[in-house]
Amino acid sequence: KALLDAKEANYLLKEYFPFSTFSPYVEIFLKVTGGMQKSGLLEVLKALQLAIGQEENKKNMVRSRKNDREKQEQLSRYIKSLFIASPSLLVIDLDVSYADEWDYNQPLKMLPESTDQKVQTEESVRRGRIEKVQRERNELITQLKKKYKRDLVGYIWKLDYSIEKNFHYNMIYFLDGEKYQNDIEIADSIGKLWTSVTEAKGIYFSKNLHKYNGVGLIKHDEIEKRKSLESNVLYLVKTEYFVKMKLKSESGQKLHTFDRGQIPKRGQSKRSQVYTI
């Protein structure tokens, strides 16, 4: 019964995640069940088993898991490089997004259903909003670099979209912990800067204010705190295995939906001892 009900999720997933692709398993499920709305359970199970066993699908599954592992390893190395560069880091973790009334779907609701005008307007509004979301993120990071200069040791961001949460970013910033300790105030100031950059359309949630694990001041030898931080960061990658944003510019160029700062140069290191986790 649950499997047959899940066939109805085909439409809902595409509606709720219009800019996303899914894990190979979900993609196979959607493709197989998309044309089997009137089929029985046994027919669906046989079709799924056959599809999963196909060589091309097997390769896609292996490739997807490999890419996921490589991303996790890259981020793990990045975090370790930041602690090599700085004896302590002030970790700022924010979710930034847009108020409901600024969801790009709002103007589309005023259009008549099933018209060429709606299709064209949807695409135009979608492209315009994507570019705006990208510009506003770039502007936020640019202003933070100007303010903190080299004390902004690193950062990680990920862009997502769903109907419920609109466009939203997970952002983690790493400041020099020897110079900055007041993480709650700094997180709030970055959130307010986001509101300013978005012309009061943006909202934010501070994980520092709510004292999540893996945020605030973390010294290079505080292994448990570092494990919590790494767990938070790697979670962003793990969720991409199931639902991953894919965006393109008007020219068709692929746009980043996940990025990090540069690995600090060896000459920037402020200490020689390296702690492993």
Segments and roles (model prediction):
Residues 1-22:
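Long, charge-dense tracts
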Residues 2, 12, 25, 44-47, ...:
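Charge-rich, solvent-exposed alpha-helical interaction surfaces
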Residues 17, 21-41, 57-85, 109-115, ...:
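Catalytic "initiation/cleavage/transfer" segments centered on a nucleophilic residue
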Residues 46-61:
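Eukaryotic intrinsically disordered, low-complexity regions enriched in serine, threonine, and proline
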Residues 76-156:
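Signature for HUH/AEP ssDNA processing cores
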Residues 95-97, 160, 239:
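Structured loops at beta-to-helix junctions and adjacent beta-edge loops in soluble globular domains
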Residues 99-103, 174-179:
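A short, flexible beta-alpha/helix-coil linker loop
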Residues 154-178:
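Histidine-centered divalent-metal-coordination microenvironment in nucleic-acid enzymes
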